[in-house]
UniProtKB/Swiss-Prot annotation:
Its EC number is 3.-.-.-. GO terms for biological process: defense response to bacterium; killing of cells of another organism. The gene is 10. Disulfide bonds: none annotated. It comes from the Viruses. The keyword Acetylation does not apply. This is Endolysin A. Belongs to the L5likevirus endolysin A protein family.
Amino acid sequence: MTFTVTRERAQWVHDMARARDGLPYAYGGAFTNNPRVSTDCSGLVLQTGAWYGGRTDWVGNRYGSTESFRLDHKIVYDLGFKRMPRGGPAALPIKPVMLVGLQHGGGGVYSHTACTLMTMDHPGGPVKMSDRGVDWESHGNRNGVGVELYEGARAWNDPLFHDFWYLDAVLEDEGDDDELADPVLGKMIREIHACLFNQTASTSDLATPGEGAIWQLHQKIHSIDGMLHPIHAERRARAGDLGELHRIVLAAKGLGVKRDEVTKRVYQSILADIERDNPEVLQRYIAERGGL
């Protein structure tokens, strides 16, 4: 069952890892409360899963090995690990806090594992669900260093690995992340919402007396469209735009969107004006359309 990791817990996990970054590799070892005590690859991965899960029995407890995953040992599942589906993380219904890669060669030096902590972009960064994550690995010593965090550590999907798992856990408030928690952004959203949906009064000279604040912004925009488009269409029709003239003809015949008698008379009057002032435009329209 998927469990939830608090942000405080995720921060603690990263703090524990940072405190052990740079330790020498310790085959068969296990982390303890002493940050100078090291472990090997599987100890690191399994104990990190226990950290995320809030287990209290992790001190000096290796839990298993790389082969514990391959052999489906119960402890692996008890810690919360599950096999990655064929489609990878994209096929999961959640965004896991930890991803794991394994190489199986029979155990010992012939097997390896590493993980990526997905609850931070980089060491010391804020806790958040990350696309990149922080790689975390214990490997053979290089210049005396075996445990590495981020720089020098393999990612969960390194080409070395061929078996992939994830910790069935999510970060709390995963979908809400930081963006909407930003007070500046929140203020902007409230202001935009107010502009769009607060009701205001009409500023027209012909507004109905006593009408008050009844109009939302989108209604005023629709009103502007309703007022300006007919004016624009009439001007273009008088100048010879037969497409706009056709709109006016339809409205005058009661075939437009609005078919009331007042609307028809308005556009019949416009046609009469065009016939009086620009008869050649109507003649071209009739020639093309075969009549009004």
